[in-house]
Amino acid sequence: MLDVNNFEYMNIGLASPDKIRSWSFGEVKKPETINYRTLKPEKDGLFCERIFGPTKDWECHCGKYKRVRYKGVVCDRCGVEVTRAKVRRERMGHIELAAPVSHIWYFKGIPSRMGLVLDMSPRALEEVIYFASYVVTDPANTPLEKKQLLSEKEYRAYLDKYGNKFQASMGAEAINKLLQDIDLVKEVDMLKEELKTSQGQRRTRAIKRLEVLEAFRNSGNKPSWMILDVLPVIPPELRPMVQLDGGRFATSDLNDLYRRVINRNNRLKRLLDLGAPSIIVQNEKRMLQEAVDALIDNGRRGRPVTGPGNRPLKSLSHMLKGKQGRFRQNLLGKRVDYSGRSVIVVGPHLKMYQCGLPKEMALELFKPFVMKELVEKGLAHNIKSAKRKIERVQPEVWDVLESVIKEHPVLLNRAPTLHRLGIQAFEPTLVEGRAIRLHPLVCTAYNADFDGDQMAVHVPLSAEAQAEARILMLAAQNILNPKDGKPVVTPSQDMVLGNYYLTLERAGAVGEGMVFKNTDEALLAYQNGYVHLHTRVAVAANSLKNVTFTEEQRSKLLITTVGKLVFNEILPESFPYMNEPTKSNIEEKTPDRFFLDKGADVKAVIAEQPINAPFKKGILGKIIAEIFKRFHITETSKMLDRMKNLGFRYSTKAGITVGVSDIVVLDDKQEILEEAQSKVDNVLKQFRRGLITEEERYERVISIWSSAKDVIQGKLMKSLDEVNPIYMMSDSGARGNASNFTQLAGMRGLMANPAGRIIELPIKSSFREGLTVLEYFISTHGARKGLADTALKTADSGYLTRRLVDVAQDVIIRETDCGTDRGILAKPLKEGTEIIERLEERLIGRFARKQIKHPETGAVLINENELIDEDKALEIVEAGIEEVWIRSAFTCNTPHGVCKRCYGRNLATGTDVEVGEAVGIIAAQSIGEPGTQLTMRTFHTGGVAGDDITQGLPRIQELFEARNPKGQATISEIDGTIAEINEVRDKQQEIVVQGAVETRSYTAPYNSRLKVAEGDQITRGQVLTEGSIDPKELLKVTDLTTVQEYLLHEVQKVYRMQGVEIGDKHVEVMVRQMLRKVRVIDAGDTDVLPGTLLDIHQFTEANKKVLLEGNRPATGRPVLLGITKASLETDSFLSAASFQETTRVLTDAAIKGKRDELLGLKENVIIGKLVPAGTGMMNYRKVKPVSNVQPTEDMVPAE
């Protein structure tokens, strides 16, 4: 057998008849499968053991030779070779066809490849192949033309007239003759001449033909191989036949299809031997052609062949296609051993890097390890008895299991895995019961909750896999979210509430103004009821371990609360003492106003001080981010565990809970509603008098009720007590918001109907009062729409992620520096006047393209190719610089990837990105994962027609697929001035742009809003009317940079409007993939073909070559492809075929004789190699793990 895992590349091509025969181990002559009595394969049939190998290991068909000692012997009685039965998975057979047939992929595809080679229409081809017309194959010296079609009648007439002077025939034989007559070199030269003169349709056709003919010429495939003389039969184990319980057989559809081919082939042979009339023979040949078509691609032409119950049979093509096909089901979706799944429950006692694994599950998963250990410890004599011990669950097994799982990480995964944090490593601890215990802080990353979610466990087996899991995937290492570099493990719900309650301050609480010598004394007083957690007290500053106090502060008393003393115990000693939720307190030091001299009147000072806000969810997030920045991963994960414990403990102690009595109903609600109602009546009066239109009336009613609800909401919030549990939950960010509260205690407000239009009848009741039947009915609309939307959105968003991953899967960091001298100009992203993304956000973690100097002092702030970190970015912004040249993935020169400098910092680790990081997949996941949070709706603004702006998910799809947007804007194609704006017929507006050389006029629909006025100076690509620009148009008019910036800006706009932050670099990686291709306009002296799509790198290489020889380079224009199109245009045919349109991709690749260099991740997964990213890259492959080595001095890197 060939070494399956070690090859450099993979080729695909057409198989010649000789090639097919060389694969084969024998000819299948009979349609029989197995003998119904003996259940053994029939000789020469579809399962024949002589051709395909024995059905049982080391045993021939007749039983003369049994056992392995006869290995390689061919039985003299039955002719079966004695070998392993698994050869039946790889040995092929063949069928010698009595008449040639055409391969349906090449004849039926779009465009028809056979048609292009022969310059015949697919209609004509079909008539010939299916025996409806004759085609002239050799006109000799008659007036007929080669490739001319003749009907039966015409053929007879010409035969009478010219006799045997000319030759015409039908079927695939005729096509085969024509294909063999083609002289590729001559045809290609003729077409190249034709291209120089022709225009329009003829030119397009010529380009298409040239492409196919060149492909044949360069690949070494012969056109006549598109016609099959011999048909390969795939190995029987790949089209199995199994016996069911009832004694019946279930078989693969392929066997039926093969059987039809063999039957028709044998009948045709018999008819030819008998010398049957030509009409019968022709009919049989046509049926054979149809049988082969059905086998290769059933249903491509005519009605599909059906099995029992009118179900179309699955042909060879269907075996590859779609989600259930070979590619996506078996090659990219393999199931793995050593895995299990169970329900998850919360494990609040766990450390960040731990998970609880049920005992029985762990025993099953680690069985082989336990067996080995049992034997090594002498508790079992051999593997068999060890296995028996485990199956009987004897007591000593548990001790061994404990020692085996120690420091052996497992992977936990929750479906759907939307980003890389959906699968993380943990150290297992054994737990009773049957549920997996999950650490509460990783729930955000998994998007898990404990209402019945299930998770899967996988065991990394090899030492390398364990090391990778521990170093790269351990939950304690994955604190930052790859999409924006912010911590993903912020506390939530109970934990937030506990810490909020702990840090509350209350004026006049019990024991206010007491002075303590240290924390312990304060806690003692709290436990004995002398002070409360919320009491403001004073503590000697020098008793606290905090290092950040200044000398002056140390000598004084610190004013704080007992709760804050407890809270600060969990922070590192060199972190400022947190006394108020402000940026300066987190980043610099505790403000001086909290310190007072010893001997001062503490109570009086405290009474004058304002109350400080407690620590809400956002502040906790900022504290975590700051700790991560200063102390790095290990310290952060320890601190997070402490914060979690504190939160749970104090939310339990606080006993915060919700009762009906906590929902306080507003007293003057009725008056507000009556006032609103009278305003609505007024509006109605105006409408009835014809003073306002229906549309205006509707708008006004809606706005009256909305403002009434706002008034109620405002009053409610004011009337709430600080310690009201509902208020605390919403204020702390634990659960709920002001709107939820308004619905509970105020009014539910306006609802939308199923079409998304707001119903003008508001729900005046609140949940506390109860809804009337009508109100209840109205609110069901909204609820149902919400659920339906969510279901649709999930599928849409998942499909978007799949396309994004597919287009960017081969983008890997391949080198340190590509040496480019280009970059992009980073400015703040604005929408109108509102800043969507600040300049410093765009700069952090990027490399500077040019040296940046302070505009006033001239001091160098940052050098060329230097990393801009948080502090440097702040310096740049504070210096008043508004735009900065930075390195970007847009301008990176690395083929098949990006370089470290152009990419910048890895957001997930906060450090430089490593060579080998799969940044393409990370980018795709970062954009796709928040997809479910985006809205589905198209917003209707004020009912102005033609003004529906697409937002949310549909807009993202529109941008990445480069579709013509809804509500398209008109853009100017030239620089110039707006000369005039006129109204023309049909209420349209005409905008005349006067340039230096030419004048252009644009018409815009009557109701579109203009963005320009007469006399304005405009540049090419500028918008004239409101709406979204079509990026393809923009590319025609302007340059690459403009389009890149536009796409980046638009994508960011959609996400930021929904409150989702995504790093620019992710969008850059995706947009770069969409702009990778160039359409060749003029080939110059290169050997590229005009009209073809080429990768930018291939294009520049080809040009470099001719320029060095002093010849004319090719010219091309960049093309913007949508992500689906871009993934199908990738260089790797394996990746493209496993994505969509499998047959088209493979047909094309086979004709071109494509070679897949296996550069991306997908191709390597498909063929079962390690992916060429991360530790799978060539330079890491040489690293071998060594077990149990004691570390020495020289192993430890210097700090």
From Swiss-Prot:
Its cofactor is Mg(2+); Zn(2+). It catalyses: RNA(n) + a ribonucleoside 5'-triphosphate = RNA(n+1) + diphosphate. Binds 1 Mg(2+) ion per subunit. Zn(2+) 1 binds at residues 60, 62, 75, 78. Keywords: DNA-directed RNA polymerase, Magnesium, Metal-binding, Nucleotidyltransferase, Transcription, Transferase, Zinc. GO terms for biological process: DNA-templated transcription. This is DNA-directed RNA polymerase subunit beta'. The lineage of its organism: Bacteria, Bacillati, Bacillota, Bacilli, Bacillales.
